Amino acid sequence: MVLSNVKIFRLKSHRAFRIGPMIKAVAGNLLVKRFYQPKLERIPPASLLLKQKIRLAQNGSTTSTENPISFSQTMSEIFSVLQPSAPDLDEDETSGLKRDHLLTERLNNGELGVIMNKFFNPSSTHNNQLIDTNILLQNFPKLSGNDLDLLDFAINEKMRGNWNDLKQDFIQLWYYKSFGFLGPRTQFVLTNSSPSLRSQFLKLPFIEYNWFLLQNNKNANILPADVQNVVKVFHLDDKRFSWKSIDPFSKAIISFVVFVSIYVWLDESAKQKTKELPAQKSTVISE
């Protein structure tokens, strides 16, 4: 019995000695997997992310019937029955993702460079120079809707990166697309503009006047020979509050408020004087 017990104890100790290192190795691997996460050096491309979004959106629409019916789903189904012509949000999201994916592929394929070389002087675009103004004004209206969509998408994508890496012709095209030939200027009105300015006081639709023409009624005497030498000089100043820049209705309201304030002040001062007189008489009688 004693020998058998000694053998059993030796077997158990030998097994424990063999199992101990295995447990330590497994525990070490778990700790490494738990606290160590390798860094991915390569970022997935945008086209792959868009494809994944489209696939997830389509899978979500197909598997939504398998999930338990929620209150929002039942309400959306009821409204879809009541309004069959209403747009489907899932379809709109999927179509938007497909459109972004298509524009990303067009941008990665270099279609924007082809458009710029076709319409805006290829020699200047390769040398990273500005586009000629006459060429820009003549050829920009020739761009189709698809070309403008690609340009807008490229602007939204490239503006997120470093602006120092952008070419001069692309910056010029971006500027012209955003502001036109006038630039980001305020209070800039052309003399030959047909639409008249509306009064901003309460946005009255029945009162219209061209305030710019009222301020510039002076006739300029220019000889026909000097017309070619005339340079249009536009005076651009900051927005300042002045009495001349206020429309007549605002002037009337301000004048009325000032008149009422003066009247109330005079009335209150007169009442104060009438109250002070009996007080003075009472003090004199008491003395």
UniProtKB/Swiss-Prot annotation:
Q: What is the lineage of its organism?
A: Eukaryota, Fungi, Dikarya, Ascomycota, Saccharomycotina
Q: Report keywords, A-Z.
A: Membrane, Mitochondrion, Transit peptide, Transmembrane, Transmembrane helix
**Origin: domain of life:** Eukaryota
Annotated Gene Ontology cellular components are: mitochondrial membrane
| Function, in words | Involved in respiratory growth and required for cell survival in the absence of prohibitins or GEM1.
Residues of the transit peptide:
1-24
Q: What is this protein called?
A: Genetic interactor of prohibitin 7, mitochondrial
**How does this protein lie in the membrane?**
Single-pass membrane protein
The residue ranges crossing the membrane are: 250-266
The species is: Saccharomyces cerevisiae (strain RM11-1a) (Baker's yeast)
In the record, the note on similarity to other proteins reads: Belongs to the GEP7 family.
Q: Does the keyword Transmembrane helix apply?
A: yes
Q: Where does it reside?
A: Mitochondrion membrane
